């Protein structure tokens, strides 16, 4: 594993990063050196490389923010793909806003760090850099950051320092919160392609028959019922990547609440519309306000980061349940 990781680091440093500089030069025009007033660390979600799902991006972002705090470096966030983040989230205690027109793209006056190979040992991320640096990263390395710098940062606390819902998003949160009430648990499932939704890359195959799909859906609904029995008189927020499952659980005799809208994976979809973005943000903010959060898993399903990290935002108890 370490040997493979070292190879990926080498590819990042010797191939991906120079290629990104060449691509930027073609897009922006040639500039050898540009001076600036500050030299921030900028986390990039710009669609120029794959970024992963919502919480892959947030995991990487929080890691780089923690490092910037530890090193005393300004931190900014350039999130424009597949939507502009500032439509839905705004700075809370720390101003991370920056426009790409304000960024430094002089060939010799900025660095980019594409850090696919840093998951095991993120040593390249720890370096204090004197020039503006654009980071591409998708992992939670906060424990390693704390160990390296002697800090005690908490993921949810850092998230809350950075973000709060915009007035636009808050209107939807207030509406759906009023519908579900205050007394609820949250249950999340991630089937990916198993039920035939085809909203994901080919990480896992679609089940081969309708009977297999029906059996998996029935088993998942029974798992929801078992959890419900542990929480009498409590509503259940259901969040899932499968519209097939959502339509089936609506038919079950359970007090479930489902945020209206369609689910898409923000990296594989290529683009999302406003209603899909609202559903994603509302799902994870409502999850963060639940009494407890559960993630259901069965062989072939994906152990999603979405519910676990949403729970961290609200400092809510989280449990994986295998069925």
Task: Please report, for each region that a protein language model flagged, where it lies by residue.
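Secretory-pathway glycan-assembly enzymes, especially type II membrane glycosyltransferases
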Residues: 13-209, 214
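A short glycine/serine-rich beta->alpha loop
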Residues: 47-52, 272-273, 292, 296-297
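A donor-sugar binding/catalytic signature common to diverse glycosyltransferases
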Residues: 62, 278-323
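Residue-level detector of anion-binding/catalytic polar loops
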Residues: 74, 255, 292
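Acidic carboxylate-rich catalytic motifs and surrounding loops in phosphoryl-/glycosyl-chemistry enzymes
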Residues: 75-82, 234, 238-243, 297, ...
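Short, aromatic/basic amphipathic alpha-helical patches
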Residues: 88-97, 101, 244-255, 307-312
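Structural motif
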Residues: 184-185, 235, 292
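Catalytic donor nucleotide-activated moiety binding site of glycosyltransferases and closely related
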Residues: 188-196, 218-272
């Amino acid at each position: 594993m370490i040997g493979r990781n070292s190879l990926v680091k080498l590819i990042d440093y010797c191939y991906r990063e120079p290629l990104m500089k060449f691509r930027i030069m073609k897009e922006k025009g040639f500039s050898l050196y540009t001076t600036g007033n500050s030299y921030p660390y900028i986390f990039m979600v710009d669609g120029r490389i794959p970024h992963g799902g919502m919480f892959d991006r947030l995991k990487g972002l929080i890691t780089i923010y923690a490092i910037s705090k530890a090193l005393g470096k300004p931190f900014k966030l350039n999130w424009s793909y597949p939507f502009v983040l500032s439509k839905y989230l705004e700075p809370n205690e720390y101003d991370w806003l920056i426009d790409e027109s304000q960024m430094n793209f002089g060939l010799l006056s900025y660095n980019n760090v594409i850090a696919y190979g840093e998951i095991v040992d993120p040593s390249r991320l720890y370096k204090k850099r004197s020039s503006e640096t654009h980071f591409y990263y998708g992992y939670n390395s906060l424990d390693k950051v704390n160990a390296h710098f002697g800090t005690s940062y908490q993921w949810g606390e850092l998230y809350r320092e950075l973000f709060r819902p915009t007035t636009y998003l808050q209107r939807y949160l207030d509406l759906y919160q009023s519908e579900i009430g205050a007394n609820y648990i949250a249950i999340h499932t991630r089937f990916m392609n198993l039920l035939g939704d085809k909203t994901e890359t080919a990480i896992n195959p679609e089940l081969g028959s309708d009977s297999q799909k029906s059996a998996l859906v029935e088993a998942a609904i029974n798992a929801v019922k078992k959890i419900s029995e542990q929480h009498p008189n409590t509503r259940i927020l259901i969040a899932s990547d499968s519209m097939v499952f959502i339509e089936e659980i609506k038919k079950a005799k359970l007090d479930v609440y489902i945020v209206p809208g369609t689910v898409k994976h923000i990296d594989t979809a290529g683009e999302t519309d406003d209603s899909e973005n609202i559903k994603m943000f509302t799902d994870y903010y409502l999850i963060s306000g639940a009494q407890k959060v559960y993630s259901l898993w069965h062989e072939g399903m994906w152990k999603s980061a979405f519910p676990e990290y949403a729970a961290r935002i609200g400092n809510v108890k989280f449990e994986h349940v295998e069925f």
